[in-house]
UniProtKB/Swiss-Prot annotation:
Gene this protein is translated from: GET2
Name of the protein this chain belongs to: Golgi to ER traffic protein 2
GO molecular function terms listed in the Swiss-Prot or TrEMBL record: protein transmembrane transporter activity; protein-membrane adaptor activity
Topology of this chain in the membrane: Multi-pass membrane protein
Any single GO BP term: tail-anchored membrane protein insertion into ER membrane
Keyword rRNA-binding: no
Positions of region (Disordered): 1-72, 87-106
Subcellular location, principal: endoplasmic reticulum
Amino acid sequence: MSELTEAEKRRLLRERRQKKFSNGGASSRLNKITGQASSHLNAESPLDAPSAAKTTPPASVHSATPDIKEDSNVAPQLDLLKQLAAMQGQGTGKSTPQDSSTPDLLSLLSSMNTGMPSAEGTPSFGQAAPAAPINQAALDYHDYLLNRLKAWTILVKWVFFLLPYLYLITRPNSSVWPAYAFTQSAWFAPLRNPSNFTRIFATFEFLSISIYYQLLKNVEHKSKIKNLQDTNKLVKLVSLVPEGVIPVANLKGKLITLLQYWDLLSMLITDISFVLIVLGLLTYL
């Protein structure tokens, strides 16, 4: 019989020692070493207890709580779906209750145009807050007052001043004028002189346009509607452009001023055209 190697000897010794400990020898050996043979303390060796298999539950792959990042992405999508559903329900004629937290599309566009309000309640972009929509009946009434003012202005200027004055300078010796005593007075003589026509016509136009402008302001005050800000389509179109897109400061205000000057200038051009036509007719008739 061959001799055992050192490794085999150590293995057999370890197996015998393990078998001895498993039969209860570990506790008695521990008591001898520590001197607690007659002690009431628990001196049972852990080696004497049967080894219980410890099972650990597998770690869950996914956490029970939802991901915060995922919730932040889902919330706007849900709001957008609610808004689209509400708009679709309105388009098909069905009354769909809309969540109070869902923003209105028109209000969102309006807030983008005017800017978010600051602490003082004014828009951050420097634009005025959007006014309430004007009733169509009020617009019709304003147009009626404006057209009536223009009609009366043209009638008074043409019939009661321009037409008689043009007839006077083209026919100063007509048999119509001696019938009126005021035509023979000294202050009436400059009116009969054709060389004073340009100065007299310019003075009359300045006075008539000034009076018309004041009456126009009275119409706006009476109807509570501004003639250009609330009725002109070009001004409304420019007001939709956000501040800073076009490199012109106060573009809406400058456009309104330009349109006001054009309105007054168009009246002057109309009167000049009327004068030229009447002078041509009176000259060749």
